[in-house]
Every structure is written in structure tokens, then in C-alpha cells.
């Protein structure tokens, strides 16, 4: 983004410091493009700092349309089902970077676990399970548990059950009355 060249202002890994761009501009190259944007993806919170060839890109997490995402305040912050993941993953990756503490938990129930991509099945994935929402709220590291329970309660009441779920199309299954619809 625009702050890539200002190390103290930058959201990035420690290796992305703009050296290549600086070398090119020092030699006369001009810069173009979207300096205020980025192509980010939702990534495993506890992934290593640099690549693991055995894992490849399995640290990415793109099954969010089948669940919800919550931030540190315990609240949803995006319409996870606005479109298919191919059209939203980079946009939502950036949105996650703008959340408090730059993370989000993805929440799924047992009805959709068979739909999750293989990247959710690697042994390095951070995963917690619980028998109740209250129990889950205590296991989500960095999340306000009281707000999370409230958010899930509102979510569960808002989900339309009169429309059959079909994961292969925009089926019209949605919510009613939430600040951020799905």
C-alpha cells in the first residue's frame, strides 16, 4: 500500500520493505498502480513467517461463505455471503487487516464442515471446537466472549430457514434485521 516505503507505517511481513521497487525507481522506473490497495487473503493466524513447501498455500482460508467471521470485538464485520469466494477473498483479506488486532475467527457449525476446503484439514490449522456457543466464546483467543455470544444469538435468530440451502448457487438464503446482512 501507500505506506510500503514507510517502514513504521506499514502492515506487512518484515521481509516486504520495498527494496525491489526502490532499486527500480533509483534506475529511472516510474511507478503506477493502486498504491492504496492490496491483494490480501485470509491466512492462518499461526502460520510461520515464511513459506513451508510441504504446506504450500494451504494456510489460506477461503470457506468463509459457509459460516461467519468475527473480529476481536466479537462482532461480524462483513457480509461473508455477498458472492462466491473467488470474487471476495482478496477484498475480505484487506478488510481483515483493518480489524482490531488484524485477525478474524471463522465460525462454522457441523452442518457445513463437509463443505470446507482441504486447507482446513491440515494439521497446522488453528481450530477450536465446543459443544455450546458459551464454551466456544471462551476458546476464541483475543475475542470478547460476551459480545461474541450476543452476536451469535442475534445471528441465529436472523437466519432465514424458509429457503433451502444450496452451496452451489446464490440460493437466497440470508438473514433479516442484522446491521450487516448475509
Tell me the role of every PLM-derived stretch:
Residues 5, 19-20:
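Extended, hydrophobic alpha-helical segments in both membrane/secreted and soluble proteins
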Amino acid at each position: 500500500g501507500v505506506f510500503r516505503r514507510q517502514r513504521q507505517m506499514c502492515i506487512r511481513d518484515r521481509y516486504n520493505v520495498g527494496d525491489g521497487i526502490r532499486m527500480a525507481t533509483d534506475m529511472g522506473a516510474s511507478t503506477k498502480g493502486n498504491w492504496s490497495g492490496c491483494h490480501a487473503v485470509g491466512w492462518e493466524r499461526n502460520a510461520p513467517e515464511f513459506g513451508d513447501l510441504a504446506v504450500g498455500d494451504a494456510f489460506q482460508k477461503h470457506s468463509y461463505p459457509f459460516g461467519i467471521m468475527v473480529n476481536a470485538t466479537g462482532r461480524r464485520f462483513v457480509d461473508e455471503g455477498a458472492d462466491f469466494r473467488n470474487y471476495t477473498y482478496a477484498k475480505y483479506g484487506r478488510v481483515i487487516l483493518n480489524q482490531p488486532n488484524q485477525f478474524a475467527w471463522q465460525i462454522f457449525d457441523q452442518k457445513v464442515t463437509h463443505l470446507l476446503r482441504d486447507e482446513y484439514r491440515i494439521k497446522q490449522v488453528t481450530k477450536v471446537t465446543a459443544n455450546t456457543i458459551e464454551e466456544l466464546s471462551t476458546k476464541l483467543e483475543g475475542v470478547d466472549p460476551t459480545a461474541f455470544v450476543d452476536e451469535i444469538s442475534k445471528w441465529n435468530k436472523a437466519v432465514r430457514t424458509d429457503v433451502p440451502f444450496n452451496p452451489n448457487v446464490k440460493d437466497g438464503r440470508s438473514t433479516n434485521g442484522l446491521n450487516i446482512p448475509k
